[in-house]
Design a protein with these regions (language model features):
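Long, hydrophobic N-terminal alpha-helical segment
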Residues: 14-55, 60
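Acidic, metal-coordinating catalytic segment for phosphate/diphosphate chemistry
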Residues: 1-23, 95
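Nudix hydrolase/Nudix homology domain
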Residues: 41, 113-177
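Unchanged
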Residues: 48-76, 82-144
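Hydrophobic transmembrane signal anchors and adjacent membrane-proximal interface regions, especially
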Residues: 3-5, 9, 36-37, 77-81, ...
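A general secondary-structure boundary signal
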Residues: 42-45, 58, 100-104, 150, ...
Length: 177
């Protein structure tokens, strides 16, 4: 499945910042493993490096962010989101016309302890934390107001992805205790 989010009707010729990302949907007891900073919620994952395929990129990102070893065989492609945003405000305050192509995978929960994950210096600097997000919390974050201008970009995509996941009952069988 592919979803295009483009509220400003940007065309590719107007895009000044493009990246390819991967993220993992990891469900634990009806909630989802997420990272949070400055009112932004993200599923674990990140940018695909040059020459890296999508599955291997997610294996690397999950090891970096959660300290857990996964293999490509443990990931099920779920949904691709192509998200455009006009005048996206970067961390440095500059504005870009952004296009992010993100592939989301369903990944089994492997029993790791979120409190035991070691955060990087950069993550600690930005107040990053790991936690669980319930479907009730998911509804609430879409209503939150925030001083962070990037919040809407990330949280709206998270909402679309997880609501699609929750509507697919057959995907709920991958959790491992």
């Amino acid at each position: 499945m592919e979803i295009i989010m483009n509220k400003d009707n940007l065309i590719d010729e107007e895009v000044t910042d493009f990246s390819i990302k991967v993220r993992g949907i990891i469900e634990k007891d009806g909630s989802f493993v997420v990272g949070k900073y400055d009112d932004v919620y993200l599923l674990p994952g990140g940018k695909v490096e040059e020459g890296e395929d999508l599955s291997n990129a997610l294996v690397r990102e999950l090891k970096e962010e959660l300290g857990v070893d996964y293999s490509c065989e443990e990931m099920i492609p779920f949904i691709r989101v192509i998200h455009y945003d006009k005048d996206y405000i970067k961390r440095d305050g500059s504005k870009v016309n952004r296009k992010v192509d993100t592939m989301y995978f369903i990944v089994s929960y492997k029993g790791f302890d979120l409190d035991e994950v070691t955060l990087s210096e950069s993550e600690r600097k930005y107040g990053f934390s790991l936690g669980l997000l319930s479907s009730v919390d998911l509804e609430e974050i879409s209503k939150m107001s925030s001083a962070n201008p990037r919040r809407e970009f990330f949280n709206s995509e998270l909402s679309v992805v997880l609501n699609n996941y929750l509507s697919k009952e057959s995907y709920k069988v991958f959790e491992k205790k």
